[in-house]
A protein has these predicted regions:
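A hydrophobic, multi-pass inner-membrane permease signature
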Residues: 2-306
């Protein structure tokens, strides 16, 4: 007689009251984070006169493209500046990750005799800073890099905190036995780093890379100090100049009527400001969901211990 099998359905795990409360507060927090972004998008397409009289609102009565058109009027220069910003972001992030990961790998090796001295050298800029004036004198007077795109990449290429995160990840998340096995097989330090360590660092490289890319994308101070050519202006510097030109027009009482007519009968101030914000944060918002899991995993695994 065959034995009868009794299938027991697994009980569904019920969510406790605490999980519902946590979900409610997380949803509320998400709403608070998304609300300013939504308001910015709406305000960019709201009539500027309504913004000045009624203030910012989620439900405007009059819509207008004047603010966005005022920014997009710099179409050719806007495209050039977008290209400069993308180039600086991609190249700077790639070079920075390569240099910092090699630096972090060296500091994580117990047999490396100079690691303590280099660790102190790494911490000095974090504790003592020479200031912007000394950096300006060195870059322009010693290295003669005035109006060079290298000055958009080098000053923020390597940071102490990112090196510490990468070093901690190597020490705590990559088994030492893998590197010992590679050395037994005859692999040198370069081969061990590029073929074993670097591929295993993908989560934290993605996290640090996203933070670096965001820093490069939002940087305008270095361009403001060092860049003079319009063909080398990044996006943020161009948008600042657009905003200043609008403020200059608003403060000038002798504006030709042809200029006002070309801008739709009035000079948009707040709607143009919101339009510049959209142009800046748009690519970052689009890119973040693709890096979110690496961002969280890389930071939690690489920086909790150590």
């Amino acid at each position: 007689m065959a034995k009868e099998q009794i299938l027991v359905k697994p009980k569904k795990k019920k969510n406790g009251v605490g999980q519902y409360i946590l979900g409610f507060f997380l949803a509320l927090y998400t709403l608070f984070c998304a609300a300013p972004v939504v308001l910015t998008v709406i305000s960019a397409f709201t009539d500027d006169k309504e913004l000045k009289t009624s203030g910012f609102t989620y439900f405007p009565q009059h819509w207008s493209m004047a603010g966005m058109n005022a920014v997009l009027r710099y179409g050719k220069q806007l495209g050039t500046s977008y290209g400069v910003t993308i180039f600086v972001t991609v190249v700077g992030t790639f070079v920075g990750l390569l240099v910092m990961s090699m630096f972090a790998y060296s500091l994580s090796r117990p047999q490396f005799r100079m690691r303590y001295g280099l660790s102190i050298y790494l911490l000095i800029p974090m504790l003592f800073n020479g200031g912007q004036l000394s950096s300006y004198v060195i870059f322009t007077g010693v290295y003669h890099l005035k109006d060079s795109m290298l000055l958009l990449i080098l000053p923020i290429c390597v940071t102490t905190m990112n090196v510490i995160i990468l070093r901690t990840y190597i020490q705590n998340s990559i088994p030492e036995e893998l590197m010992d096995a590679a050395r037994i097989d005859g692999a040198g330090e370069y081969r061990t780093f590029f073929q074993i360590t670097l591929p295993l660092m993908k989560p934290t490289l993605a996290a640090v890379g996203f933070m670096m890319a965001t820093t490069y994308w939002n940087d305008w101070q270095n361009a403001y100090l060092y860049i003079e050519s319009k063909s080398k202006q990044p996006l943020q510097l161009l948008l600042i100049k657009i905003q200043k030109s609008i403020e200059t027009l608003l403060s000038n009482k002798n504006i030709p009527s042809a200029v006002i007519a070309a801008m739709g009968g009035s000079i948009p101030q707040w709607s143009a400001t919101m339009a510049t914000v959209i142009i800046v944060i748009g690519p970052v918002i689009i890119a973040y969901p693709f890096f979110q899991k690496y961002f969280v995993k890389g930071l939690t695994v690489g920086s909790v211990k150590g």
